[in-house]
A protein has these predicted regions:
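Short strand-turn-strand beta-turns centered on an Asx-Gly dipeptide
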Residues: 192-196
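Boundary at the C-terminal end of the N-terminal hydrophobic targeting segment
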Residues: 38-40, 44-46
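N-terminal secretory signal peptides
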Residues: 45-115
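Flexible glycine-rich active-site/ligand-binding loops centered on an Asp-His dyad
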Residues: 199-222
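N-terminal secretory signal peptides that target proteins for export/translocation
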Residues: 1-22
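Cysteine/selenocysteine-centered motifs that mediate thiol-based redox chemistry or coordinate metal-sulfur cofactors
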Residues: 222-238
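Mid-length scaffold segments of soluble, non-membrane domains
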Residues: 91-185
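Bacterial N-terminal signal peptides
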Residues: 23-39
Length: 238
């Protein structure tokens, strides 16, 4: 199959500082998986990227989530992590702003995926060792980059709680899987290798703030944002 190729722009910061760690993704939308990986009527049960296997569906506290998109984050020859985005309903959202939101937590400029109710998961499979400080700084700066000053200030108390949770996670070794889950009626839960860490942080709006790190108004790249949303096939190199 012929793929479109996208060359990522350089990150604005050094790769190991804050939000720069979350930039420059290589993404393939999950809706192409049957075409890429199926044989006959057999649909693949997992995808492989950078020697990492991501299941195409995962159970989460009674919910069944489907892989919506996945990506490899790297800098030159260095592979940093694989990311997988899971949703309860694997609908393919558009990055346009003309979709009427049924979720009060979503902003008018948010993609349609934000208005889809239900559980969600972001999985980061680390390909290098990282400290709790590196992880928390990356999440904090990614949220700050995608919210105005007033909204960021309003989120700050819960961001501080997220930083505390990440301290509980501690240093994460290469190969570890960091899950950031949204549980309806509960909130955001962080787990390392399926072991929950810290408290659950309430509010769907807070989970959407985390999703905006990759899918907000200042994503790593707009083409990659659309690819993670399933709007097109983008395989990038840097």
């Amino acid at each position: 199959m012929q793929h479109n190729h996208y060359v990522s722009k350089p990150a604005r910061k050094t790769i190991f500082s804050g939000a720069a760690f979350l930039r420059t993704l290589i993404a393939v939308p999950a809706f192409l998986l049957p075409l890429l990986l199926a044989t006959g009527s057999d649909v693949a049960r997992a995808v492989d990227i950078a020697d990492i296997r991501l299941p195409d569906s995962v159970p989460l506290d009674g919910y069944n989530l489907a892989l919506h998109g996945y990506a490899l984050r790297r800098w030159g020859p260095a592979r940093l992590y694989v990311i997988g985005l899971y949703t309860e309903k694997a609908e393919r959202g558009s990055a346009s702003a003309d979709t009427a939101s049924s979720a009060t937590s979503a902003a008018p400029s948010d993609p349609k995926l934000f208005t889809i109710p239900g559980a969600k998961r972001v999985t980061l499979v680390l390909l290098r060792d990282l400290t709790a400080r590196q992880l928390s700084d990356a999440l904090n700066e990614g949220i700050r980059d995608n919210h105005d000053d007033a909204r960021y200030a309003a989120l700050q108390p819960r961001i501080e709680r997220l930083i505390k949770v990440m301290r509980e996670v501690g240093s994460a070794r290469s190969g570890s899987r960091l899950h950031i889950d949204f549980l309806p009626g509960q909130g955001t839960r962080v787990a390392l290798d399926d072991n929950p860490k810290g408290e659950i942080i309430e509010g769907e709006d807070f989970y959407l703030a985390i999703l905006r790190i990759w899918l907000g108004p200042r994503p790593p790249d707009f083409a990659l944002k659309q690819a993670l949303l399933g709007s097109g096939a983008m395989i990038g190199t840097r």
